[in-house]
Structure formats: C-alpha cells, structure tokens
From Swiss-Prot:
Tissue specificity annotation: Kidney; collecting ducts. Pancreas; beta cells of islets.
Residues glycosylated per entry: N76, N93
Function: Plays an important role in amino acid transport by acting as binding partner of amino acid transporters SLC6A18 and SLC6A19, regulating their trafficking on the cell surface and their activity. May also play a role in trafficking of amino acid transporters SLC3A1 and SLC7A9 to the renal cortical cell membrane. Regulator of SNARE complex function. Stimulator of beta cell replication.
Membrane topology term: Single-pass type I membrane protein
Key words of the record: Cell membrane, Glycoprotein, Membrane, Phosphoprotein, Signal, Transmembrane, Transmembrane helix
Residues of the site described as Cleavage by BACE2: F125, L126
Post-translational modification: Glycosylated. Glycosylation is required for plasma membrane localization and for its cleavage by BACE2.
Gene name of this polypeptide: Cltrn
Membrane-side (Cytoplasmic) residue stretches: 163-222
Source organism of this protein record: Rattus norvegicus
Molecular function terms from GO: protein homodimerization activity; transporter activator activity
Domain description: The cleavage site containing the double Phe-Phe motif acts as negative regulator of shedding by BACE2.
Name of the protein in question: Collectrin
GO cellular component annotations of the record: brush border membrane; cytoplasm; plasma membrane
C-alpha cells in the first residue's frame, strides 16, 4: 500500500515538474566559475536549501504564506548543475501561476544569490529577468561639481587678465626703445649755415645758438 502511494505521488510530481512544463522555470548555476577553488559540490543538501529559499520567497507573496518546502519540486537535475522547478498548490494539485513565482523570485533575488554565494550571472533563472542594482547616488551633489568647475574657470580668467594688465603697464613705463638715444645724438650735432657753425637748440636746457646773436647782444652783459 505504501509503495503504491509513493509511486502515485512520484507520478504526480513527474507530471507537474518536467522541462518546459506549464509554470516551470529552468535554473542554471556556474559554481566553479564563480568561486574557483572554493567551489562547493551541488548535492541534495544544496537542493534542499534552494527549495527552502524558493518557499521563503513565496511566503512573502500575499495569500501564499502557507507555502512549504515540500511544495517546491525539482526535476531533471544535471551534473553541470542545471534543473527545473515548480511550486505546487497541494490543495488543488496543480502548479502556481508563473507570474506569482516570478514576482516572488524577483523580490528576493539578492537573498537567494547570497545563500549560494552567487550573483545574477552565475545563478540564472532563465525565464526571470535579472534584477537591476539600484542607481548609485553620487557622494557629492552634481550642482556642487558644476559650481566648482565654473568657479575655477572664472578664477583662471581673472588671473590671466590681471597678469596681462601688469605686463602692459611695465611696457608703457619703459617707453619705445631708442627715443632717449636719439635725443642725445641731436644735442651733439653742430650745423653749419653760410659758413658759420651753428649749435642746435637745446630744448632741454633752453640754450640759444650763438650763431644767431647780434654783436650788441654778444657784448651785452647778463
């Protein structure tokens, strides 16, 4: 009698959990690729943990608080660690809708990954989209960064203008080269007009050219 009951239960489970069955999901794990030398062996204990995590996730869904580990069925387990699973409703003897299972897995994906030391790439639910990490908030607000950049640009521009003004003032103080030398040369030039040597007019000292003085002016004492 017990053998007949066991055979009946096994047959029902096989009918509910099979590849590509309604509401069934395929899972693929890459334990060796993720953990390397620290990889663990996938055995019945790991299967039990997986079923427990799925049952835990389902209990978070409204009206599914009574989900037990025995309600999660695994089938077609391979050595490369892939398998199919379904979640059953024992009262109605059928599998729960795929939408409910998918929602529960997505809400608790990080908890499931952490239980096996894996992530979305090494613990794949092939029909369930990967969860996206929340966007990272910058530690410094964007407006402060923009303000800092603009402030630096304005500071550099002001510094360049100040330096340019200082250089221009120095150039104006020095004056054009060669002006003073030309004036000195003009002071030493003596011109000759009508055979009479004439000293050029000294604009700086106010001297008068003796060549243009009359005889009375020369003899008149100062």
């Amino acid at each position: 009698m017990l053998w007949a009951l066991f055979f009946l239960v096994t047959t029902i489970h096989a009918e509910l959990c099979r590849p590509d069955a309604e509401n069934a999901f395929k899972v693929r794990l890459s334990i060796k690729a993720a953990l390397g030398d620290k990889a663990y062996v996938w055995d019945t204990d790991e299967e039990y943990l997986f079923r427990a995590m799925v049952a835990f996730s389902m209990r978070k869904v409204p009206n599914r608080e009574g989900t037990e580990i025995s309600h999660v069925l695994l089938c077609n387990v391979t050595q490369r660690v892939s398998f199919w699973f379904v979640v059953t409703d024992p009262l109605k003897n059928h599998t729960l809708p795929a939408a409910e299972v998918q929602s529960a897995i997505r809400m608790n994906r990080n908890r499931i990954n952490s239980a096996f030391f894996l992530d979305d790439h090494t613990l794949e639910f092939l029909k369930i989209p990967s969860t996206l990490a929340p966007p990272m908030d910058p530690s410094v607000p964007v407006w402060i960064i923009v303000f800092g950049v603009i402030f630096c640009i304005v500071t550099v521009a002001i510094a360049l203008l100040v330096l340019s003004g200082i250089r221009q003032r120095r150039r104006n103080k020095k004056g054009p080269p060669g002006v003073e030398d030309a004036e000195d040369k003009c002071e030493n030039i003596i011109t000759i007009e009508n055979g009479i040597p004439c000293d050029p007019l000294d604009m700086k000292g106010g001297h008068i050219n003796d060549g243009f003085l009359t005889e009375d002016e020369r003899l008149t004492p100062l």
